[in-house]
UniProtKB/Swiss-Prot annotation:
GO BP, sorted A to Z: fatty acid biosynthetic process; phospholipid biosynthetic process
InterPro entries according to UniProt: FA_synthesis, Phospholipid_synth_PlsX-like
Localization: Cytoplasm
GO MF assignments: phosphate:acyl-[acyl carrier protein] acyltransferase activity
Keyword Ubl conjugation: no
Name of this protein: Phosphate acyltransferase
Record function comment: Catalyzes the reversible formation of acyl-phosphate (acyl-PO(4)) from acyl-[acyl-carrier-protein] (acyl-ACP). This enzyme utilizes acyl-ACP as fatty acyl donor, but not acyl-CoA.
Known catalytic reactions: a fatty acyl-[ACP] + phosphate = an acyl phosphate + holo-[ACP]
EC class (word): transferase
Entry's family note: Belongs to the PlsX family.
Assigned EC number: 2.3.1.274
GO CC annotation terms, alphabetical: cytoplasm
SS bond partners: none
Length: 355
């Protein structure tokens, strides 16, 4: 099965052109169906491509030297959307020159450019940034929003739940993913009005392709008891950074412990297979690729410091969403929900509104 090519912002992120191209080549080694539109400085891209013969005939270069800065405000970046590698990468999806966009650049700028170029889907007020994290079980957990919206009302949270469940079905194959709202407790009286209202709407709605299980606390996110965790972008980003920090802390703690004495070094050699498995499980590069859900197109955000394996995984996420037509799945779920939950006469003109 052929795939639409993937537009890759070769200039975005902290790692440079070579790592981005190495990642694209690694993705193509895994799946030779992948083809790319590489956006960035042609001279630097060609130099990086010289070591990857598998990219010959599978990539086209769109020359661009201008880059969105890591600390650049979204409003400033938008004014340069037609001249920057990030803007041209997203525009390739809008123009049908690519099926998906992947960038490791400034998250706020990428969201702003994507929303302006691709617009939000009917029935969705705000896009959300969704990522996956490891759990104690086989399947990863989807979490959104991870920072696209610092605030979210009940309507937004319900929409996030629908989008997150559609994404989880692609990842896990589970027809009715277990969905919970992130809260400070699991009791019905806990949390903000928005959380309680969203919970009531999800609990009462019929026809949702999910199993809504109420609230979840942050210490249970990675236990394997939930498939989708829904929250506003402010809380979601804090939770994500806390989990990533805890993972690094555990990794560093083990490294220090295993190098503290001769005996501990011997112990490391004995336990190395287990520790390598733990390291692999906690490595963010193995879970790289957050998705802007709710847009009329596929846009994937790679971590700015991702290595070539991480970039390859972000490309794989984009390809999976194209293969499984995530946008159409979300649209179908929203349409199926219909009058059972929304008052079609309300809202802001961008979709139905909650009763």
């Amino acid at each position: 099965m052929s795939l639409p090519r993937i537009a890759l912002d070769a200039m975005g992120g902290d790692v440079g052109v070579r790592v981005m191209i190495d990642g694209a080549a690694e993705a193509r080694r895994r799946h030779d169906r992948f083809k790319f539109l590489l956006v960035g400085d042609e001279t630097r891209i060609k130099a990086a491509l010289d070591t990857h013969p598998n990219m010959r005939g599978a990539s086209e270069i769109l020359h661009c030297e201008d880059v969105v800065g890591g600390d650049e405000k979204p409003t400033q970046a938008l004014r340069r959307a037609k001249t920057t590698s990030m803007g041209l990468t997203v525009n390739a999806v809008k123009q049908g020159e690519a099926g998906a966009a992947v960038s490791a650049g400034n998250t706020g700028a990428l969201m702003a450019m994507s929303k302006l170029a691709l617009r939000t889907m009917p029935g969705i007020d705000r896009p959300a940034l969704a990522g996956v994290m490891p759990t104690l079980e086989e399947d990863d957990v989807v979490m959104l929003d991870l920072g696209a919206n610092t605030e979210a009302d009940a309507r937004n949270l319900v929409q996030f739940a629908i989008m997150g469940a559609a994404y989880s079905r692609i990842l896990t194959g589970r027809e009715e993913p277990r969905v919970r709202l992130l809260n400070i407790g699991t009791e019905e009286i806990k949390g903000t009005d928005a959380l309680r209202d969203a919970a009531a709407q999800l609990q009462d709605a019929a026809g949702l392709a999910m199993q809504f299980d109420g609230f979840v606390e942050s210490d249970k996110i990675n236990r394997g008891q939930v498939d989708v965790v829904v929250t506003d972008g402010f809380s979601g980003n804090i939770a994500l950074k806390a989990i990533e920090g805890a993972a690094r802390f555990v990794t560093d703690l083990l490294r220090n412990a295993f190098t503290s004495s001769i005996r501990s070094k011997v112990g490391f050699l004995v336990s190395r297979p287990a520790t390598e498995l733990l390291k692999h499980h906690l490595d963010p590069n193995n879970h790289n690729g957050a998705v802007f859900l709710g847009l009329n197109g596929v846009v994937v955000k790679s971590h700015g410091s991702a290595n070539s394996v991480g970039v390859a995984n972000a490309v794989a996420v984009a390809a999976s969403l194209l293969e499984n037509d995530l946008t159409a799945r979300i649209a179908s779920d929203l349409a199926e929900l219909g009058e059972r939950m929304w008052d079609a006469t309300g809202g802001n003109g961008n979709g139905p509104a909650p009763k």
